[in-house]
């Protein structure tokens, strides 16, 4: 590579400035003499720190080039593997495609949970920085921050109308927020340790929470009273989720089990134990997926004539399992993630499963053929959470890299 006379002169002056400002006096005077430089005050100012600036910008640009190359390769792959430019897909089969539509930063610590609002075009993220942030997923704009917790916010959940938001935290409290005025209406105390999960029941009258104190509690939304406690897990309860009609709740724990409870009687209806490590996440199958699941697993239709209910679980043993809750049988195990599975849910079309993990990926599974059909390198660090919009073609992910990413499905 040949430099022009002017470039050579600039480089020499930048080197001379570097030598002098870093105290290499002898080298400076020799270099100045050999390069025949006449340095003066005015020129000096122009070249001050120039070498360092160029040096750092080269590294920055190299990183950018590598990022763009990887995005280009992903786009090429999309194109050849019959991506959205190939045949037209049924919207029920749309899946998230790289690159992300938005990468949103604002949190100062790892993002612990991301969820879509059931009505408006906003989503909400919770973080270890003790805040909850609201974003517009269509424009990528940051809207506001909800402050009140004094430690890491572990989980968040909307009621079906989206007027109420609940959050739980390592500060051992559960908070209820009016999502129209963005005020905290109520704070609930009762757990003796980190509250790791919270969910508003489908009827909106109650909410359930799970904690490191090994219990699950049910609370009345109107009064904030604890009305039920479910005991049985032998270790930290990681997540709790009600089924569609609110008659059952599922929970998973560090004791390596998934439990299903009957809300009315508090009895444990099923204890699902096949994972070989902490079970991090669970998700109920929507009824729209029942026929696909029955077809894929050959699971018998029961005497009642209705299949299911079905449940997904993701574990630190790097696997995802699908369960038939009525029989307690594990219907399938999906293997592919290279690290702890942190989030799992059904695609709204019912034919696919989406998952995220500490291997920094977001994966789409064609469970009928038990194969991973798409892997997106989603974040720079562990992917802690994901959500799939019920009606709009978007997926959102949150990560230890402190960002929230919005992915468009097509």
Curated annotation (Swiss-Prot):
Q: Which cysteines are joined by disulfide bonds?
A: none
> Does this UniProt record's set of keywords contain Cell division?
yes
Q: Start and end of every LisH domain?
A: 7-39
Instruction: Please provide the Gene Ontology terms (biological process) for this protein.
Output: adult locomotory behavior; brain morphogenesis; cell division; cerebral cortex development; corpus callosum morphogenesis; establishment of mitotic spindle orientation; lipid catabolic process; microtubule organizing center organization
Positions of the UniProt region annotated as Interaction with DCX:
367-409
Write out the ranges of the annotated region (Interaction with NDEL1): 1-102, 388-410
Its keywords, alphabetically, are: Acetylation, Cell cycle, Cell division, Coiled coil, Cytoplasm, Cytoskeleton, Developmental protein, Differentiation, Lipid degradation, Lipid metabolism, Membrane, Microtubule, Mitosis, Neurogenesis, Nucleus, Phosphoprotein, Repeat, Transport, WD repeat
Short name of any one Pfam family annotated for the protein: LisH_PAC1
Location relative to the cell? Cytoplasm, Cytoskeleton; Cytoplasm, Cytoskeleton, Microtubule organizing center, Centrosome; Cytoplasm, Cytoskeleton, Spindle; Nucleus membrane
Modified positions (Phosphoserine) in chain numbering? 109
Q: Where is this region: Interaction with dynein and dynactin?
A: 83-410
Which GO terms label this protein's molecular function in UniProt? dynein complex binding; protein heterodimerization activity
Write out the ranges of the annotated region (Required for self-association and interaction with PAFAH1B2 and PAFAH1B3).
1-38
- Give the CDD domains listed for this entry: WD40
Q: Which family does it belong to?
A: Belongs to the WD repeat LIS1/nudF family.
Q: State what protein this is by name.
A: Platelet-activating factor acetylhydrolase IB subunit alpha
Q: Which organism is it from?
A: Macaca fascicularis
